[in-house]
């Protein structure tokens, strides 16, 4: 494991006692570590606390090693996984991903897991995303493929924020919320 990853996981572990159980964790690699999560939370007035436990450069294998410290120990009810982007050269990446999802299901049986598809559009990403779908039951394990292009980086983040925030809800969506999400 890279020293940076272990250091970051240790830092997160130290603040676990500040986290509220039953909330949302985003567990990812480089893309999600740089994603404007807190702007999203403020914009959508999330009903839940959201903890970004993403680490730049995190591989799936490393994610398994730090899973308890970064995710399980705060007992979330939803876990977004955005991993695989650092694993293109790893022939075991998807089997490790299966192990990760299985570990979360075993350790957090009530949690809903949302798998976020890889963004880069490579043949590896396309294959990996298709394989991710095989893990979904649309009850406890769901899949979302985020918008990959926009007229600007700001517009792209806004579109992705709308997609992700729809999973943040615990209460049924109202007609007003639906119009707001679609931009009408």
Residue locations for each model-derived region?
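Alpha-helical cap/lid subdomain in secreted, periplasmic
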Residues: 43-45, 65-184
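Serine-esterase "nucleophile elbow" of acetyl-processing enzymes
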Residues: 1-75
């Amino acid at each position: 494991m890279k020293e940076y990853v272990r250091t970051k996981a240790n830092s997160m572990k130290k603040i676990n006692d500040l986290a509220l159980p039953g909330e949302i964790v985003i567990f990812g690699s480089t893309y999600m570590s740089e994603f404007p999560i807190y702007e999203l939370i403020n914009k959508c007035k999330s009903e839940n606390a959201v903890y970004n436990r993403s680490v730049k450069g995190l591989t799936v294998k490393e994610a398994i090693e730090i899973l308890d410290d970064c995710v399980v120990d705060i007992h979330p009810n939803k876990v977004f996984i955005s991993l695989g982007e650092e694993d293109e050269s790893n022939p075991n990446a998807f089997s490790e991903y299966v192990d990760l999802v299985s570990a979360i299901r075993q350790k957090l049986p009530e949690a809903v897991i949302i798998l976020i598809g890889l963004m880069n559009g490579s043949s590896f990403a396309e294959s990996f995303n298709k394989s991710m779908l095989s893990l979904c039951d649309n009850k406890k394990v769901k899949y979302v493929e985020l918008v990959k292009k926009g007229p600007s980086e700001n517009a792209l983040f806004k579109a992705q924020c709308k997609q992700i925030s729809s999973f943040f809800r615990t209460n049924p969506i109202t007609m007003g919320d639906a119009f707001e999400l679609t931009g009408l």
